[in-house]
Amino acid sequence: MVHWTAEEKQLITGLWGKVNVADCGAEALARLLIVYPWTQRFFASFGNLSSPTAILGNPMVRAHGKKVLTSFGDAVKNLDNIKNTFAQLSELHCDKLHVDPENFRLLGDILIIVLAAHFTKDFTPDCQAAWQKLVRVVAHALARKYH
């Protein structure tokens, strides 16, 4: 079990309260698909992903990015039970979608970049450390069924 300090919890929940899930989720997923183009193979049904412009303008990328970040919000609400919170999603991504678990880490790193860009003043080194810890815990929870 992961131990969260009161300060870490406050930094995470405080910033999360300011996040526009639709915008940040869309940006994070779009960046994943652009920066790591091999991840596009999991989104073949999304249509045109042929260029950064196409990806950024793709409504399915935007909708799924919102869905992903909404799920991430479940981690913020359940900091003390992230492993169980993501048990079903881990199973889905492992057994049905066959997503490489390394992609969870990549998306977490991209989320850090998006948050830093959107919340420059609030995203202090302490805040970044708390969020880095969170994205690692979420990535580990999502990869759990792979072990």
From Swiss-Prot:
One biological process term in Gene Ontology: hydrogen peroxide catabolic process
Pfam families: Globin (PF00042)
Example GO molecular function: haptoglobin binding
UniProt domain Globin: residue ranges: 3-147
Signal peptide positions on this chain: none
InterPro entries linked to this entry: Globin (IPR000971), Globin-like_sf (IPR009050), Globin/Proto (IPR012292), Hemoglobin_b (IPR002337), Hemoglobin_oxygen_transport (IPR050056)
Residues reported in the UniProt entry to bind heme b: H64, H93
Transmembrane region(s): none
Keywords, in A-Z order: Heme, Iron, Metal-binding, Oxygen transport, Transport
GO cellular component entries: blood microparticle; haptoglobin-hemoglobin complex; hemoglobin complex
Gene3D superfamilies assigned to the protein according to its UniProt record, in alphabetical order: Globins (1.10.490.10)
CDD domains on file: Hb-beta-like
Annotated tissue distribution: Red blood cells.
PROSITE patterns in alphabetical order: GLOBIN
Highest taxon in the source lineage: Eukaryota
Task of the protein: Involved in oxygen transport from the lung to the various peripheral tissues.
Assembly and binders: Heterotetramer of two alpha chains and two beta chains.
Family, per entry: Belongs to the globin family.
Listed name of the protein: Hemoglobin subunit beta
Organism lineage string: Eukaryota, Metazoa, Chordata, Craniata, Vertebrata
Gene: HBB
